[in-house]
């Protein structure tokens, strides 16, 4: 056996990293639940036919195939396998809605009646890894978690409103101070392209260029678009709208009059106006969102409102979403025809951003208090009671371990462990301390040590940790 | 595209099931952390050489291989692939300890010093899916979660003590009233076999038969052992010890005198005696554990204390563990030579047991209060404020969604949704109610409806839910 290792593009998450990941995931879950989203998990291994033809030619090349040991021997070169690893969480959602969306079960309130197995609308969140056989690189992994919240089965603009509200609440809860949810609408962009006299066939490529406006200066994007065959009049028409400035209401007002000739644009503007009204009525602080007509979002399946969150950290967007009213039909193979709208939090980027912004400063590792242990039976009892009392008070207390029988090296080992794991305090009760009814309390940050009364040691330590 | 479906032996966890799973996992995590265990996650895809030769011939056949799309074309029949899916959580733990166990990093307390990247002992928990290409059947899945807590790097009997203490605490916290942690020791069993005059080469097969004593009557097990070549004297010597009855202390006392001639047995008995003393000193209720000399545990890698938890539910053991002081060396390819002891909770069986025992009765789904919405701007504002206030009070409140513009069907849809999702209350504020400064509160369990003052509606509802 050579050196131990993992596959490129995959990661071991050791405790210090896991504690950060779990903190972010738990914060998001709490907010998802508060807004009425319910958890869903699907298998890592999907049938190939569920994934086939869903991710475009380039995407499909990145799918990992799964082969049982028995089938390895019979697999023919170039043959597709029956099973493959999950590539995203949207296709599994469409499959779940297609399979169970119309299933009826006994009504819990009245067993004689039937009710839908999945509520409609179905509001679910899903936080699971996905796999892509991409070339690994800075911030690009072959195994990474996606973290999605979607509503399937409603066209109400309240859906977009609540997804944006929960996005704002989530980033505030994670400690972000400076972030913006940029909002736009696919119908507005469609109308803009239409009214600028650009052929509808060019819509996707024009949007791809517009989407670069957050990284490139407008002149460069104009040049790129000219290279795609747009003339000066068309470019002027586009940029006149994109360059609109002011409050969200002012930008929409400007677009309303400039795009008066496009029915699609007017529909988009109408929906965004309603969204702004609802966001205000729901009390979402307008400092955290704004209409941005340069937001295009690469993926071509969006049909309505689109949004994307950017922060002060240099990591790119930390979350994005939008309405996609035709995708569930396509992805479920026509088994479910339901409108949908969702948002996705970029877990790895959020972690990188929080690291950059110093938002993990107060996160502690698992250990809080280490009670050293010497193996003397009378003393053991006292140490055990102290640990038990601390744990009952909600403190993460540990007993020091030593080899049997106890040797002086055992104490050095235990203090080394306390240091490696970042404990706040160590408590030492030896035979001497016990005879005096005392314990030695060592603050492992300042390295100062003091004597405290044994009888009230647990209370005193719990109090200091929680102050 | 044919019918939608999943691979046999895998499962979609819809919200009602997920809520139960998350409840159990969150309960276990809280207890792991309290005892100083830290989270670890490793990639689903491992290098083949990490897994090869670790699970025996039969186990290895169940491993799923992973192939990128590009490699499908060049894969030769029968050829092993470079990568495969995780089969358990113990081999990845050994790999992690082998890779990072001796790595040094800057000491957080003093950057000029170096400290170990992983604390020693390393106390980690890991809750992740594993994959096995087994034939699916009742309670046998191809993708299922394992839930392990292990301590690597200490021979202290405090490790076993705390693992059993946390096991008892976990099952109590999950609501189990009637359960037992059965405890035995591999050295005691080894000494028993030795002293009965049975060849050491027969140890594994004899233990396999003894392990069946919880399902088969002693006569059947005797018959099976006789079939394996044991004579009457050997069988009597075995069963004289196994049949010892009484308190844990009495059983150990009996074994101590019957197995006086075996050094291994006396070592095992000495360690179990210390364990009982420590469990009592730590205040673990002795109603929940006992020495059971018929417990053998199938896996042959255990070297010391072994234990297994059984409950009143008919699902088999719900958890098990033990000390395995040589396994990390073997599994890490000799990169780490550390003693270890761990426990594993059987998540699927725990869920089945809790279902059987009715321990999920009080678990609620995501929805608590649905505030119906009619789309009238003035009323909207009131509904939004009500939802916002309820959420701030920690209530899982949702706004009803309806298609725009609102039609009378919208109200029926919203009440249908409330029913499907099991909400406790629906709140209705229409123009009439608003004019009277009232809201209609419908209890969705009793289906009774009453008028409440709008101004204090949020407080009143939050109070009822929390009472």
Curated annotation (Swiss-Prot), chains A, B:
<dbReference type="InterPro" id="IPR041715">
    <property type="entry name" value="HisRS-like_core"/>
</dbReference>
<dbReference type="InterPro" id="IPR006195">
    <property type="entry name" value="aa-tRNA-synth_II"/>
</dbReference>
<dbReference type="InterPro" id="IPR045864">
    <property type="entry name" value="aa-tRNA-synth_II/BPL/LPL"/>
</dbReference>
<dbReference type="Pfam" id="PF13393">
    <property type="entry name" value="tRNA-synt_His"/>
</dbReference>
<dbReference type="GO" id="GO:0006427">
    <property type="term" value="P:histidyl-tRNA aminoacylation"/>
</dbReference>
<keyword id="KW-0436">Ligase</keyword>
<dbReference type="InterPro" id="IPR004516">
    <property type="entry name" value="HisRS/HisZ"/>
</dbReference>
<dbReference type="InterPro" id="IPR036621">
    <property type="entry name" value="Anticodon-bd_dom_sf"/>
</dbReference>
<dbReference type="GO" id="GO:0005737">
    <property type="term" value="C:cytoplasm"/>
</dbReference>
<keyword id="KW-0067">ATP-binding</keyword>
<dbReference type="GO" id="GO:0004821">
    <property type="term" value="F:histidine-tRNA ligase activity"/>
</dbReference>
<keyword id="KW-0963">Cytoplasm</keyword>
<comment type="subunit">
    <text>Homodimer.</text>
</comment>
<keyword id="KW-0547">Nucleotide-binding</keyword>
<dbReference type="InterPro" id="IPR015807">
    <property type="entry name" value="His-tRNA-ligase"/>
</dbReference>
<keyword id="KW-0648">Protein biosynthesis</keyword>
<dbReference type="InterPro" id="IPR004154">
    <property type="entry name" value="Anticodon-bd"/>
</dbReference>
<dbReference type="Pfam" id="PF03129">
    <property type="entry name" value="HGTP_anticodon"/>
</dbReference>
<protein>
    <recommendedName>
        <fullName>Histidine--tRNA ligase</fullName>
        <ecNumber>6.1.1.21</ecNumber>
    </recommendedName>
</protein>
<keyword id="KW-0030">Aminoacyl-tRNA synthetase</keyword>
<dbReference type="GO" id="GO:0005524">
    <property type="term" value="F:ATP binding"/>
</dbReference>
<comment type="similarity">
    <text>Belongs to the class-II aminoacyl-tRNA synthetase family.</text>
</comment>
